[in-house]
């Protein structure tokens, strides 16, 4: 603390005797009060981590002056924690293990090397679907009994049967559908779905496909998983969430998020850097979450801040009351649509206004998770009373929540309506009252219709010419009524009659309120005396057993069943509309009357395959509207003014009479859904699973590298490590490895996905006695530098001007031969010839990818000369000790008359500074100047040390 210039801001937290914090609100009160909440979180991190070297005092004052300095001032940011998915976690932890080896060779204690902040690694990306054929059984007795290593599954809330017991349903269990066709992630279906009898909430034997895929997952990835387990034993600040537990964003939101962190009595706001694209979801909880690449996350783990350009912050004011018929999905999609149209790309969006309190945490996190849809970096909901209530419901003890509230009030991070609102770069307004429910159809999902306009639109479709929407029904036939007998009762069918109504939750699992709304609507409908006509084929496909648990625990499942919405199975409901044909009498009546019969579905937007041949119009609607239209029996209805039906007493029942209020839905969600969801996940993580628990892992401080391993290998990043960094050496007679054009992406540099059979990486694996089906993917082998280096620039779409055609080839200048990039680089390194890359504009576009910088370094590349860089990749090059040089404005290799077959010599001065001009000489006599594209002194320091890894390692020597 004594080295921190802001130490004077530290004070005890009111009401506690053992907790202190930086009261950043006292730094400059007036300026602080005008800051957006998300910027206040950044300021607190800078103040708390200020060391005068990587984080400077001036950085804090630049943030206080945010509105004037945003978009051009860069500030360092250290998160409270780091979250890794397994593909990015492997190389990061391999580097930490290698660093321990390196400092131990200098006689230092390797136990010193640990992540500087809490680091959570979630192993959710390793599963591949080797088997997709599920057991579809008429009863459980036909499913093989599982005797060994059953993974943990959620239990039914009701009475359970033994593993070998038979479900004695008269109708039989229809089982799960094809996993390969499931909507959403198939991996999530396997990892998160308890295997329950869909009719009776009884545990059943696991589907054969899931069991085999999980078994193969552990066998195929055993080395990686053993390494992860060693990490949990060897390193402080590292926790691993094993496979079969949940996806990164689910675990981050439901288990890892703290809102307020505490370390040795010191408290501060939670914030996270995550390598999963869904990291931004936690911004809905008031936790600043940023999605980053592997090198940025690794830097933060090493205690090195990432660089943020102070962003514009768009204030999104939510006003008005939510339309009673609008579901959470309507609200979420409408807000994201507004943001997309407003153009918020690259900004932080912060929500305020009296409408914010109407959004549940599930709504907020869904909006925050959809950042990629509208291009924002962050969609931030400051902590408020809704957030604090959510924490209590998810198992955080009352005393802790009280402490959080006291702290957040002290540093003015608790959003309240009666305080001064922050200043924003720009303010958008969204009136929640303007959000109305929509349905889509009748032929295309992109044709959206307000529910209020549904009757008018359907009648217009009857008149329109046959085409994208029209059916061209003659006016005299539009009022036709066709009598039909079904189950000894008489009915009449007309245009718009509903004959299929299917509720699915494939796309609604992340926000259960819409399914609860449907269930509560069904309950009220039954209590009001309404029924669904028996000829309408109704069905319910929950998407996962978790949704069934919600519906059962809240007591609404029997009411859905009473209306005919019986559960037909889990996963993808392909069978909806196709399992059994419509009753013959109904089909005959539709055909004879040439009726435009309708199906109403929720969930799947690709609904063409769900249609029966006699159903001309298909509409997509939210689950509660599916129930409503089923009750009405027609889509040709104005739900605002026309009754759904009559009860036994002849009283008309309108939708407004039975539609559950938002408050009712939220109460059920908060009392039933959220507590069960979080307690189940917590139990699952604490118990872990049998396979993980039985997995052997070393107990040593240093990792015992297996030289035969093709997954885990000690990287050579520290092989030349010295206590004192050597002075910058001149680069003499360097050859060009690659001469590239504009917009070269990180995928060109380090391709993801499968390993081609003819690639250098494949040849290496074959030499290790692997056959092609054992190659796995580049992602799975990120812990093996030999594979990843051979995969560098191995993209088939790479265009190298030295070769003149696409492919992972280059021209080896000394021999005059065209060969694989890796083979050429290997020859150059044997000859001790330094290498450079020449490129055009926007070098390093695309996803942040650590091996796009690590790979070139291991190929022997010491310099890249480009017209311009994608900033993140340029930072990665610096982080690996590769000098990013930039042609002067208006110049490039072509204008300078370079062929890239010359030899290049240049020297970076010992007193190198950011943007230093450097002279480059060629063996042909040509000279030109470039700019050293270092943006700050920290980058120069990292480069002089040979990269961030060496910089941090020397701190331990």
From Swiss-Prot:
Cellular compartments annotated: Cytoplasm
Mention one GO molecular function. Answer: 4 iron, 4 sulfur cluster binding
Q: How is the cofactor bound?
A: Binds 1 [4Fe-4S] cluster per subunit. [4Fe-4S]-binding affects RNA-binding activity, thereby inhibiting activity of the protein.
Which residues make up the binding site for [4Fe-4S] cluster?
506, 572, 575
| Protein name, entry field | Iron-responsive element-binding protein 2
- This protein's source sits in the domain of life called Eukaryota
The keyword Cell membrane appears for this protein: no
What family is this? Belongs to the aconitase/IPM isomerase family.
Q: Which PANTHER family match?
A: ACONITASE/IRON-RESPONSIVE ELEMENT FAMILY MEMBER
Broad class of the protein's primary localization: cytoplasm
Gene Ontology terms describing biological process:
intracellular iron ion homeostasis
PROSITE patterns for the chain: ACONITASE_1 (PS00450)
């Amino acid at each position: 603390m004594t080295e921190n210039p802001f130490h004077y801001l530290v004070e005890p937290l009111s009401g506690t005797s053992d907790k202190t914090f930086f009261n950043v609100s006292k730094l400059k009160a007036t300026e602080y009060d005008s800051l957006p909440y998300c910027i206040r979180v950044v300021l607190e991190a800078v103040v708390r981590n200020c060391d005068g070297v990587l984080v400077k005092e001036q950085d804090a004052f630049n943030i206080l002056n945010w509105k004037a300095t945003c978009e051009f001032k860069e500030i360092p940011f250290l998160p409270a924690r780091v979250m890794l998915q397994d593909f990015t976690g492997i190389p990061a932890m391999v580097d930490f293990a290698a660093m321990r080896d390196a400092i131990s060779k200098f006689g230092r204690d390797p136990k010193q090397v640990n992540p500087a902040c809490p680091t959570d690694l979630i192993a959710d990306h390793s599963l591949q679907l080797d088997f997709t054929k599920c057991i579809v059984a008429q009863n459980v007795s036909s499913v093989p009994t599982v005797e060994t290593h059953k993974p943990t599954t959620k239990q039914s809330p009701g009475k359970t049967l033994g593993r070998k017991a038979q479900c004695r349903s008269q109708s039989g269990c229809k089982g799960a559908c094809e996993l390969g066709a499931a909507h959403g992630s198939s991996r999530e279906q396997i990892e998160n779905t308890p295997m329950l009898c869909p009719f009776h909430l009884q545990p059943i034997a696991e589907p054969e496909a899931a069991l085999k895929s999980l078994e193969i997952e552990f066998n195929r990835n055993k080395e990686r998983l053993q390494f992860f387990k060693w990490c949990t034993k060897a390193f402080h600040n590292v926790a691993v969430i094993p496979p079969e537990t949940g996806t990164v964003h689910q675990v981050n939101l439901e288990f890892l998020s703290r809102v307020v962190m505490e370390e040795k009595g010191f408290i501060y706001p939670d914030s996270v850097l995550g390598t999963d694209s869904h990291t931004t979801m936690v911004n809905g909880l008031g936790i600043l979450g940023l999605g980053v690449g592997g090198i940025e996350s690794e830097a933060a783990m090493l205690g090195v801040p990432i660089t943020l350009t102070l962003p514009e912050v768009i204030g999104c004011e939510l006003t008005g009351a939510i339309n009673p018929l609008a579901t959470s999905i309507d609200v979420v999609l409408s807000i994201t649509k507004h943001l997309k149209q407003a153009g918020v790309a690259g900004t932080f969006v912060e929500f305020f206004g009296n409408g914010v309190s109407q959004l549940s945490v599930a709504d907020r996190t869904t909006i925050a998770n959809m950042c990629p849809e509208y291009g924002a970096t962050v969609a931030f909901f400051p902590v408020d009373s809704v957030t604090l209530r959510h924490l209590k419901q998810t198992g955080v003890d009352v005393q802790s929540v009280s402490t959080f509230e006291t702290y957040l009030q002290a540093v003015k991070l608790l959003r309240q309506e009666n305080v001064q609102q922050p200043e924003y770069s720009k303010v958008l307004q969204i009136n929640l009252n303007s959000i109305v429910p929509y349905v889509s159809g009748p032929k295309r999902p992109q044709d959206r219709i307000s529910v209020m306009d549904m009757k008018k639109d359907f009648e217009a479709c009857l008149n329109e010419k046959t085409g994208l929407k029209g059916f061209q029904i003659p006016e005299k036939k539009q009022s036709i009524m066709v009598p039909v007998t079904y189950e000894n009762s008489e009915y009449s069918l007309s245009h718009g009659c509903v004959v299929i109504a299917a509720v699915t939750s494939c796309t609604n699992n992340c926000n259960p309120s819409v399914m609860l709304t449907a269930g509560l609507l069904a309950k009220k409908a039954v209590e009001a005396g309404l029924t669904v006509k028996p000829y309408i084929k109704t069905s319910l496909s929950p998407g996962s057993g978790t949704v069934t648990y919600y519906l059962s625990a809240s007591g609404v499942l029997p009411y859905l069943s009473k209306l005919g919405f019986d559960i037909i199975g889990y996963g993808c409901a392909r069978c909806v509309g196709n399992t059994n044909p419509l009753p013959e009498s109904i089909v005959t009546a539709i055909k004879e009357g040439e009726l435009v019969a309708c199906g109403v579905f929720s969930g799947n937007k690709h609904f063409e395959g769900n249609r029966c041949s006699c159903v001309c119009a298909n509409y997509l609607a939210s689950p509660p509207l599916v129930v409503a239209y089923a009750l009405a029996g027609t889509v040709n209805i104005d739900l605002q003014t026309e009754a759904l039906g009559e009860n036994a007493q002849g009283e008309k029942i309108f939708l407004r009479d039975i539609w559950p209020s938002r408050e009712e839905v939220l109460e059920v969600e908060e009392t039933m859904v959220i507590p069960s969801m979080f307690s189940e996940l917590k139990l699952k993580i604490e118990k872990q699973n049998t396979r993980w628990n039985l997995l052997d892992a070393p107990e040593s401080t240093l990792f015992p590298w297996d030289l035969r391993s093709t997954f885990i290998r000690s990287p050579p990043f520290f092989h030349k490590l010295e206590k004192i960094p050597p002075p910058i050496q001149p680069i003499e007679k360097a050859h060009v490895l690659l001469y590239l054009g504009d917009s070269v992406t990180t995928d060109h540099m380090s391709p993801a996905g499968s390993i081609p059979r003819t690639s250098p990486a494949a040849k290496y694996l074959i030499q290790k006695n692997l056959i092609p089906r054992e190659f796995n993917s580049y992602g799975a082998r990120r812990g093996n530098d030999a594979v990843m280096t051979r995969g560098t620039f191995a993209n088939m779409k790479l265009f190298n001007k030295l070769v003149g055609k696409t492919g992972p080839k280059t021209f080896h200048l000394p021999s005059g031969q065209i060969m694989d990039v890796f083979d050429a680089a290997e020859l150059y390194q044997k000859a001790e010839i330094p290498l450079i890359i020449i490129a055009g504009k926007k070098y390093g576009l695309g996803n942040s990818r650590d091996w796009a910088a690590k790979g070139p370094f291991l190929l022997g590349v010491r310099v890249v000369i480009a017209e311009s860089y994608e900033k993140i990749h340029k930072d990665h090059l610096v982080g690996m000790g590769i000098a990013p040089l930039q042609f002067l404005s208006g110049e490039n290799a072509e204008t300078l008359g370079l062929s890239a077959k010359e030899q290049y010599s240049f020297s970076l001065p010992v007193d190198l500074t950011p943007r230093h001009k450097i002279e480059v000489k060629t063996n042909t006599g040509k000279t030109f100047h470039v700019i050293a594209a270092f943006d700050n002194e920290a980058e120069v320091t990292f480069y002089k040390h040979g990269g961030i890894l060496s910089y941090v390692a020397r701190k331990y020597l």
